[in-house]
């Protein structure tokens, strides 16, 4: 079982239950899924860029990415409807817990000048979004094997009903929030 999932069951869930006065154990906030997205705008001109991004994403998450296509044509960006413009992976279950553990304990501390993640990136419904400037912070990515440095978006979807519950859940799981 994932180390973080164990910690959730042993320490985090009971603490959340007590803090928010939750009686029903099924109402305790937990992680639902983590969506990792990599937008590759250059893929419109060069399809090899998308292959590199998909390879990186597969290495980081341990799961095959899904190609995301443009929903509509935008002449200014030279994009036609249906052109591949990015890659996405939805993580659930064990892989989700393993990924979050690696993100918190290995990847984020490797970010240059890291002072913590923004405590304001909640969406009002208990979900957290985080942007990473370069994929090189993940230990699975070797600096020499990368064709270009790309950023990625990470959306952490929780069952929490409020931002306060979600913030407390992530804080107890070890998410390093920047002090306000």
Swiss-Prot record:
Domain of life of the native organism: Bacteria
SUPFAM superfamilies recorded: RL5-like
Keyword hit for tRNA-binding: yes
Single Gene Ontology MF annotation: tRNA binding
Keywords, ordered alphabetically: Ribonucleoprotein, Ribosomal protein, RNA-binding, rRNA-binding, tRNA-binding
Annotated Gene Ontology cellular component terms: ribonucleoprotein complex; ribosome
Family: Belongs to the universal ribosomal protein uL5 family.
Function: This is one of the proteins that bind and probably mediate the attachment of the 5S RNA into the large ribosomal subunit, where it forms part of the central protuberance. In the 70S ribosome it contacts protein S13 of the 30S subunit (bridge B1b), connecting the 2 subunits; this bridge is implicated in subunit movement. Contacts the P site tRNA; the 5S rRNA and some of its associated proteins might help stabilize positioning of ribosome-bound tRNAs.
Quaternary structure, from the entry: Part of the 50S ribosomal subunit; part of the 5S rRNA/L5/L18/L25 subcomplex. Contacts the 5S rRNA and the P site tRNA. Forms a bridge to the 30S subunit in the 70S ribosome.
Identification of the protein by name: Large ribosomal subunit protein uL5
Organism: Rubrobacter xylanophilus (strain DSM 9941 / JCM 11954 / NBRC 16129 / PRD-1)
